[in-house]
Amino acid sequence: MESLRIYNTLARDKQDFVPRQPGEVRMYVCGITVYDYCHIGHARMVVVFDIVQRWLRARGYRVTYVRNITDIDDKIIRRAVENGETIQSLTRRFTDAMNADFDALGVERPDLEPRATEFIPQMLGMIEKLEANGYAYQAKDGDVNYSVRKFANYGRLSGKSLEDLRAGERVAANDAKEDPLDFVLWKRAKPQEPAGASWESKYGAGRPGWHIECSAMGCTLLGAHFDIHGGGQDLQFPHHENEIAQSEGATGQTFVNYWMHNGFVQVDSEKMSKSLGNFFTIREVLEKFDAEVVRFFIVRTHYRSPLNYSDVHLDDARASLTRLYTALKDATPDAQPLDWSEAHAQRFAAAMNDDFNTAVAVAVLFELATEVNRTREPALARQLRLLAGLLGLLGREPREFLQHAAGAARTGALEPHEIEARIAARVAAKQAKNYAEADRIRAELLEAGIALEDKPGGSTEWRRV
């Protein structure tokens, strides 16, 4: 198989992927802060990196995939206080909700899923190293901060210079930071904070800053220097920039070789956000659309491109996925393994090896579906199912999807028992030679999004359209 090329944010270009250890990939992705239900932007991130790890494994790599959980944070503390519940109760509840949402989307669990609160000693150890190396200082307010001007390569990932970043910054008269760009490593506990919000340390009771959490977990679980670090585009600066400064300042080694960032989800060409009121949780979306349709909607756009969310686009994704399942409905795949020498498989692999270009890979699936429709060839049906499976798609029985998932979540959609009752009435009308009534029922069902197919022998199959 040809070499894999990955767009490396650090290099601002595609590069051949060469893992540090032959045949082995270590990858860290910034996960969720568990204080609320996950939104469609989170869905995109986890589906994107789910596909990355699936493709790496398909290429034969031994992958260690780490995706963390942030279970201590200012937002978590505020929400727990607002709700009158403990931090642990809040984070446990939303971790369970997160897992349910991601499972529904067909996202495979990471190999390791560390919780920030499990790594407090490692975070403090890294902070102490940074202090010893001259990168950290304890301010007069008790916080421990990172001194960005001490790190020569600060801004390399984001392409921002310290001078550009300082432009427009104003330092308050009582600001404890030496530089307005300095960021917190350890936040001193405040008297009004609830139980479970702080830990004892040589710097006094407090909790870790967000950035040090990922540095410590990544270095502890994958080593000081690993292959791939990923996350949403919004994390490039300051989070990932700060991770580099912390990790390399503490260890003296290159932190990560390849940085990957997925693009934003947009609504009406604006970034989705709570402040704009164009915010959709995964649960809200799954009330209207089948989970595999949502996954397909994400997969068919290249991960670095903006993803425009709308019901119209999801309806189109449903119709497109229905086309793929329809191709498999009357062509049973054979039981042979995937044939990588076959032309469609080669084009699919070429797309995926070109920076995980799922948009082109999905186009290959439609080319293959056209051939399956034309030939009903079991070998081609197998290729379609197995290639789609590498994207986490087409894993269900076609008739199950076509009858129960393709459009079933639409408002007013007919239930299966209602459809079967109308088919029975149509059969009775045909037996009574009342063909006008039989045609009326067929047209009525089609208007409701149900297509009928009369089979030899007198049976009738149906599917949603």
From Swiss-Prot:
<keyword id="KW-0547">Nucleotide-binding</keyword>
<comment type="similarity">
    <text>Belongs to the class-I aminoacyl-tRNA synthetase family.</text>
</comment>
<feature type="binding site">
    <location>
        <position position="274"/>
    </location>
    <ligand>
        <name>ATP</name>
    </ligand>
</feature>
<protein>
    <recommendedName>
        <fullName>Cysteine--tRNA ligase</fullName>
        <ecNumber>6.1.1.16</ecNumber>
    </recommendedName>
</protein>
<dbReference type="GO" id="GO:0004817">
    <property type="term" value="F:cysteine-tRNA ligase activity"/>
</dbReference>
<dbReference type="InterPro" id="IPR009080">
    <property type="entry name" value="tRNAsynth_Ia_anticodon-bd"/>
</dbReference>
<keyword id="KW-0479">Metal-binding</keyword>
<feature type="binding site">
    <location>
        <position position="243"/>
    </location>
    <ligand>
        <name>Zn(2+)</name>
    </ligand>
</feature>
<dbReference type="GO" id="GO:0005829">
    <property type="term" value="C:cytosol"/>
</dbReference>
<dbReference type="InterPro" id="IPR032678">
    <property type="entry name" value="tRNA-synt_1_cat_dom"/>
</dbReference>
<keyword id="KW-0030">Aminoacyl-tRNA synthetase</keyword>
<dbReference type="InterPro" id="IPR056411">
    <property type="entry name" value="CysS_C"/>
</dbReference>
<keyword id="KW-0436">Ligase</keyword>
<keyword id="KW-0963">Cytoplasm</keyword>
<dbReference type="InterPro" id="IPR015803">
    <property type="entry name" value="Cys-tRNA-ligase"/>
</dbReference>
<keyword id="KW-0067">ATP-binding</keyword>
<feature type="binding site">
    <location>
        <position position="214"/>
    </location>
    <ligand>
        <name>Zn(2+)</name>
    </ligand>
</feature>
<dbReference type="Pfam" id="PF09190">
    <property type="entry name" value="DALR_2"/>
</dbReference>
<feature type="short sequence motif" description="'HIGH' region">
    <location>
        <begin position="32"/>
        <end position="42"/>
    </location>
</feature>
<dbReference type="InterPro" id="IPR024909">
    <property type="entry name" value="Cys-tRNA/MSH_ligase"/>
</dbReference>
<dbReference type="InterPro" id="IPR014729">
    <property type="entry name" value="Rossmann-like_a/b/a_fold"/>
</dbReference>
<dbReference type="Pfam" id="PF01406">
    <property type="entry name" value="tRNA-synt_1e"/>
</dbReference>
<dbReference type="GO" id="GO:0008270">
    <property type="term" value="F:zinc ion binding"/>
</dbReference>
<feature type="binding site">
    <location>
        <position position="30"/>
    </location>
    <ligand>
        <name>Zn(2+)</name>
    </ligand>
</feature>
<keyword id="KW-0862">Zinc</keyword>
<keyword id="KW-0648">Protein biosynthesis</keyword>
<dbReference type="GO" id="GO:0005524">
    <property type="term" value="F:ATP binding"/>
</dbReference>
<feature type="binding site">
    <location>
        <position position="239"/>
    </location>
    <ligand>
        <name>Zn(2+)</name>
    </ligand>
</feature>
<dbReference type="GO" id="GO:0006423">
    <property type="term" value="P:cysteinyl-tRNA aminoacylation"/>
</dbReference>
<comment type="subunit">
    <text>Monomer.</text>
</comment>
<feature type="short sequence motif" description="'KMSKS' region">
    <location>
        <begin position="271"/>
        <end position="275"/>
    </location>
</feature>
<dbReference type="InterPro" id="IPR015273">
    <property type="entry name" value="Cys-tRNA-synt_Ia_DALR"/>
</dbReference>
<dbReference type="Pfam" id="PF23493">
    <property type="entry name" value="CysS_C"/>
</dbReference>
